[in-house]
């Protein structure tokens, strides 16, 4: 049985902290033995107690001095520094945790960038870290200087209990191997699984319509999370978890129901397997986000047990039988002489799932488990989050809704199933999705660690480059970058899909493509980008075909999940006007769900479809 993360961490830290006092005692004992001078107990005790903080202070001072000299040697400077008010800058850590729990996304980062510039140095508990929203620095980290950055040991330790050694938690040769193993599956032909999208979207829309007919609002975030989970499990494993078969939740003041979205805190005592799996996914990711926020001291929160252990048990109970069945099929095929096709032939096999593809390449159950879980989390949460925010904006901006629906009816019609060619022609649909991804990128923060020392570009053309020490974390926030007016213009806070269609494209985006990074960039750019665009586009088209109007229903949400009233007075940018509370674990989500009401379209032929729930 593995030890809880906190136990070995505490042992390591105790040994480190005890080193200086032990040295003091050894020196005092040496003096007494070789000079017959017995030092008084009180100065030895005082020096022993003070030796640890003094050692830490000296190490921090020396590190800063060394960095300053190294920067001068390279003709560089250190970025502006966020200086805290408490020992070890613990107030900085406290403010970041408070923002995560009770604030608006990137509150603390926005304040820093406004006061100190778009790249800031932080020193918490003696460690140096950088925070940036500068597109040129992000470009350096993700692309031009890619080989000098990695996920880093600390990040991988924080994520290991959930992501294992999967593609999102691997570096170097391991990452290259995972990437090469997965890439062939995500070709244009494979990601056009529109029959799957059609079947699942019809189920989802039917569930919504039934609830609307009963006079209730629907938590769209819950519903779309079921749609993406069912689509992802069928697409990736060929075995659907069928979460859409479970009842939808009711508004907070209506009938109590089984679990909906974990943020609503309405988990029933006996949820279905699908509901339990969905809940476990989100709760595990919340733990991971808290670990990242705590930094190196995260194991202190897990002294008795791993906080992801129970959630992963539920997930593994679902995944393990699927993996064992796939490996058994592979063995059976080998036994009857069917053999394994060469890669080229197999890559063209119709109906092959990602798991089928991976099983042809490896029989290692741990590798298979980690890889499919990584892809499942990415395939479910990112798409669900974006579609949730698209529907929010369509409710907030009826003119955008009407224009988008008009494009759908013109290009596809009120009943037809959209094709890949249809979606390619729908420029306004893509603009709506992109504008949503700009204001609410599903991964608001990300991190890389430098391997060697180097420099980062200074936004001041006349300034010296910024020095980057080795083994230093660089956290970059596309959430803040996507809203900075120096990159997107004076209307950066406004939701306006036309910015991706008019002259602002050439003025801002074409000039610097790295100001828009919803799918990351460089060698680690999202492999499933086109799959996500196809899935989101398909579902939105179906939504426009079925419904002629939509509006928010905040009265249906738990009152404590709504934005605090003071945001309208003290908030910055969109924080002042938003009608939902965005939060983040690994990806963005809406606190308490996204409750909406919709009006069924008169021009949709309800008899034209045969939908089974």
Curated annotation (Swiss-Prot):
Topological category with respect to the lipid bilayer: Multi-pass membrane protein
Glycosylation sites: 434
Coiled coil ranges: none
Cellular component per GO, a single term: membrane
Top-level taxon in the UniProt lineage: Eukaryota
Record's subcellular location: Membrane
Keywords per UniProt: Glycoprotein, Heme, Iron, Membrane, Metal-binding, Monooxygenase, Oxidoreductase, Transmembrane, Transmembrane helix
InterPro entries per record: Cyt_P450 (IPR001128), Cyt_P450_CS (IPR017972), Cyt_P450_E_CYP52_fungi (IPR047146), Cyt_P450_E_grp-I (IPR002401), Cyt_P450_sf (IPR036396)
Pfam family for this entry, one: p450
CDD domains xref list: CYP52
SUPFAM superfamilies found in the cross-reference section: Cytochrome P450
Entry similarity comment: Belongs to the cytochrome P450 family.
Described function: Cytochrome P450 monooxygenase that is able to use carbazole and 3,5,4'-trimethoxy-trans-stilbene as substrates for oxidation.
UniProt name for this protein: Cytochrome P450 monooxygenase 75
Organism of derivation: Postia placenta (strain ATCC 44394 / Madison 698-R) (Brown rot fungus)
Lineage: Eukaryota, Fungi, Dikarya, Basidiomycota, Agaricomycotina
């Amino acid at each position: 049985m593995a030890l809880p993360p906190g136990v070995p961490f505490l042992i390591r830290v105790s040994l480190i902290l005890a080193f200086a006092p032990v040295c003091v005692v050894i020196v005092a004992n040496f003096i007494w033995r070789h000079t017959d001078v017995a030092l008084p107990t009180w100065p030895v005790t005082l020096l022993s107690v003070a030796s640890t903080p003094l050692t830490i202070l000296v190490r921090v001072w020396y590190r800063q001095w060394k960095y300053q000299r190294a920067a001068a040697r390279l003709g560089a400077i250190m970025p502006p520094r966020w200086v805290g008010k408490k020992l070890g800058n613990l107030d900085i850590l406290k403010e970041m945790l408070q923002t995560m729990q009770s604030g608006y996304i990137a509150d603390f980062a926005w304040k820093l960038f406004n006061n100190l510039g778009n790249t800031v140095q932080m020193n918490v508990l003696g460690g140096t870290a950088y925070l940036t929203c500068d597109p040129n620095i992000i470009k350096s980290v993700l692309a031009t200087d890619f080989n000098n950055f990695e996920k880093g040991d600390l990040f991988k330790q924080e994520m290991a209990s959930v992501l294992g050694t999967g593609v999102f938690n691997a570096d170097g040769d391991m990452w290259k191997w995972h990437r090469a193993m997965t890439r062939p599956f995500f070709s244009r032909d494979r990601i056009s699984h529109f029959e799957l999208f059609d079947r699942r979207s019809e189920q989802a829309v039917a569930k919504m319509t039934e609830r609307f007919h009963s006079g209730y609002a629907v938590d769209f975030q819950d519903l779309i999370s079921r749609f993406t989970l069912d689509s992802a499990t069928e697409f990736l494993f060929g075995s659907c978890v069928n979460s859409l078969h479970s009842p939808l939740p009711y508004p907070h003041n209506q009938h109590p129901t089984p679990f909906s979205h974990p943020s609503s805190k309405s988990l029933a005592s006996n949820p279905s397997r699908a509901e339990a799996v969905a809940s476990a996914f989100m709760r595990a990711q919340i733990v991971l986000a808290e670990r990242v926020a705590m930094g190196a001291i995260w194991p202190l929160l897990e002294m008795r047990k791993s906080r992801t252990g129970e959630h992963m048990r539920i997930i593994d109970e679902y995944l393990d039988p699927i993996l064992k069945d796939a490996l058994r099929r592979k063995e059976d095929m080998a036994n009857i002489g069917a053999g394994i096709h060469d890669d080229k032939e197999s890559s063209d096999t119709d109906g092959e799932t990602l798991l089928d593809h991976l099983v042809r390449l490896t029989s290692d159950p741990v590798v298979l488990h980690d890889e499919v879980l990584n892809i499942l989390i990415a395939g479910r949460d990112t798409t669900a989050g974006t579609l949730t925010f698209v529907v929010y904006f369509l409710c907030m901006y009826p003119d955008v809704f009407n224009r988008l629906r008009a494009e759908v009816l013109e290009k596809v019609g009120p009943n037809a199933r959209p094709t890949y060619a249809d979606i390619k022609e729908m420029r306004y649909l893509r603009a709506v999705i992109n504008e949503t991804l700009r204001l609410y990128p599903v991964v608001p923060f990300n991190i890389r660690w430098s391997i060697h020392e180097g420099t980062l570009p200074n936004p001041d053309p006349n300034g010296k480059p910024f020095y980057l020490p080795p083994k230093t974390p660089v956290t970059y926030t596309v959430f803040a970058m996507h809203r900075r007016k120096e990159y997107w213009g004076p209307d950066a806070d406004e939701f306006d899909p036309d910015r991706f269609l008019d002259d602002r494209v050439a003025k801002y985006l074409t000039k610097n493509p790295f100001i828009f990074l919803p799918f990351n960039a460089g060698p680690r750019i999202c492999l499933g980008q086109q799959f996500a665009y196809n899935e989101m586009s398909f579902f939105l088209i179906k939504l426009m075909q079925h419904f002629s109007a939509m509006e928010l229903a905040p009265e249906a949400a738990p009152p404590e999940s709504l934005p605090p009233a003071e945001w309208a007075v003290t908030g910055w940018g969109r924080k002042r006007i938003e009608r939902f509370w965005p939060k983040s674990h690994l990806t963005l989500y809406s606190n308490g769900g996204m409750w909406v009401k919709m009006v069924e379209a008169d021009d949709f032929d309800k008899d034209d479809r045969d939908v089974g729930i």
